[in-house]
């Protein structure tokens, strides 16, 4: 104990001999490095959690938690009780194991309903179970789509009749809960409708209605009239957005970013025009048909006095009166005036009117008339057509921009921990060298002549070695003494 006090007093003298700056560095740097190393070690030892399942019903959540407890896996549950988190390194393996056990079922029962059916069931119970099984299997299939988070299918099966004329058609409705930011295309809606109709007997696609969680009838997208209206609305929005971007870019380059806000409303004419023209050119004629006819008639003239003598033919060798020859020519030519027919269909979208609304920050001083002329020229507006420009100057609300903290990679913490350990080692090495600088030992008394030094004197330990040995044997007392010195300053 006396040796411990002796060395502790020596250590205290060494510490008191240091300057205040050296004292602060000797105590603060090791503590700081130890703190950094501890923080880095704690962070690296923490497990990263990831989502195992989300959107779970209470029954499914209970089933998943039960299986996780059996596996001895740590988990966390979100405040709303619909999402469960597990360590990232075991998430994939757990999904495979739970899927093999049929967990979670999302509250939907399919053909596995018949696994628990009783021995004796009435015909009505069999029909109900069959309908529930089909509904469940269809819902599972629909939920395999990327955009569908939850699906529910309702089928109405009519009772079979002995008369074909009285037989009714089956009907079905599908409810979909879409994932945030997802929208089904008309092709996907049509595929869902065909899937349901193809899975149920006597169910036509036209008898299937698809509704989403926002109350919209998605089957309306398949109507031709709706497609036309939706297409026209899309063209209108694209036209308006194009003008907005053009004006917004031009004005922000002049007044600065965030100083103006542009809104454009356009009225477009989607009507098409069909035109048919017939042009006649009287100077250009063409022969359509031509017909020519020629007739020639030869007859003998009558001679002498009418009566018997006139009817008696002349004697042989006697030259009688002359012959009568008649010719007739007829020519018919049909002409037609040149005609040209033109068929023309104009499907060009026409702009009927454009209205531009501009909101500008009140801090910006502008000439309203010049700004209006700039907008008219930039957007190609025509006041004669009825185009309008409205400018309003109001103070803008300055949003509070919260800078997103960048995620520090793991290797940065590892590097900090290694550097901290290196610096801690260097500081410890410096302190050891500083403490080993003890004052010169007193001159020992001369040894008795002729008497050699003992082995204990030759192998006598240095004060630093003895101090380390005492600290190992009684660390608690050494710590108490160091704390006392720190308090004394």
Curated annotation (Swiss-Prot):
Signal peptide: none annotated. One of its GO terms (molecular function) is cytoskeletal motor activity. Its main location: membrane. It comes from Aquifex aeolicus (strain VF5). The chain crosses the membrane at residues 24-44, 412-432. The basal body constitutes a major portion of the flagellar organelle and consists of five rings (E,L,P,S, and M) mounted on a central rod. The M ring is integral to the inner membrane of the cell and may be connected to the flagellar rod via the S ring. The S (supramembrane ring) lies just distal to the M ring. The L and P rings lie in the outer membrane and the periplasmic space, respectively. Keywords: Bacterial flagellum, Cell inner membrane, Cell membrane, Membrane, Transmembrane, Transmembrane helix. Belongs to the FliF family. It is a multi-pass membrane protein. This is Flagellar M-ring protein. Pfam families: YscJ_FliF, YscJ_FliF_C. Gene3D superfamilies: 3.30.300.30. It is found in: Cell inner membrane; Bacterial flagellum basal body. Residues 299-311 have a biased composition (Polar residues). One of its GO terms (cellular component) is plasma membrane. Residues 290-322 are annotated as: Disordered. InterPro entries: AMP-bd_C_sf, Flag_M-ring_C, FlgMring_FliF, FliF_N_dom, YscJ/FliF. The gene is fliF. The M ring may be actively involved in energy transduction. GO terms for biological process: bacterial-type flagellum-dependent cell motility. The lineage of its organism: Bacteria, Pseudomonadati, Aquificota, Aquificia, Aquificales. It comes from the Bacteria.
